[in-house]
Amino acid sequence: MKDPKSYRSNGIGASVKRLEDDRYLRGRGKFVGDIRLPGMLEIAFVRSPLAHANIKNIHKPEGVEESVFICEDLISVSGIKADSGLPGFKSSVQPILASKKVRHVGEPVVACVAKNRAAAEDIADSIHIEFEELPAIHDMKTAMDAGNPLIHESWDKNCFLETNVETNFDEAISSASSIVKRTFQTARQCMAPMEGRAVVAQWDNQLSQLTVHSATQMPHIVRTGLSECLGLEEGKIRVVAPDVGGGFGYKGILLAEEVFAGWLAMKTGRPVRWLEDRREHLT
């Protein structure tokens, strides 16, 4: 019988030399933040500071109207639909920009556009939103209690799917050698990769094609979602995932910011970019 230790040189348990590190260590990686296109616009979002609130009014200072966008400007854009073929699944729609109500801290309400990120953030700082704060839910147990606020008013309760697993639980408990009962609570999670979410969108009017560079782990999901939200054929959308500076799962979904960037590129005919900053990521 062959000595198991011999497999460590070229088989299971072997130390495999990494081939991709050299160019990263030399600063030769190509991330979305490295993309520079002529005439590119930058986006900054005004986000909700509250977990649950009605939007009463949005005040824009004079002179920035053409650089500020709210949900009413996106009437041709569909929200991101959460749906499933599972029996009993309750579907929901996430608006690209919050309409009438916000449902979580950090939800984008207003998008501001300028020639650079600093100017876009200056415009965002000048926007004032009047909120009517509503009771919020902070954990799953409270969310299921009767009488607490509904996340989606059309639902009868805050549960999007119920499933049943049949087993003889009482028999298993009665035959167990020991039973441990504990209640555990975990804090909210934050992936904190080196690179945040990021997108560059460019519209080619001659080809009627949208090209999106996204820091995504699932470019095909992004392409399908953009097609549904923007009303474009998938064949007219090209999603490019360049080097991605970490993801850990949170870059595996379609983002409202990606949809807005695609729409804005189509509207203006200019390339647009949004780079998530650390504060946006943490909220």
Regions found by a protein language model. Give the residues of each.
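Cysteine-centered functional microenvironments
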Residues: G106, V240, D277-T283
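Short beta-strand-initiation
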Residues: K30, L41, L97, E107, ...
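Alpha-helical support elements that line or immediately flank enzyme active sites
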Residues: F45-L74, V110-E130, V199-P242, G247-T268
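Flexible, low-hydrophobicity surface segments
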Residues: M1-K157, I179, K267, W274
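Acidic-residue sensor for enzyme active/binding pockets
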Residues: E20, E195, E257-E258, E280
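Short Pro/Gly-enriched beta-strand edge/turn motifs at strand-loop
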Residues: K81-S84, S174-Q189, R273-L282
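Helix-loop-helix junctions that connect adjacent transmembrane helices in secondary transporters/permeases
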Residues: D145-L230
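Short gly/pro/ser/thr-enriched loop/turn and capping motifs at secondary-structure boundaries
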Residues: I75-G79, G245, H281-L282
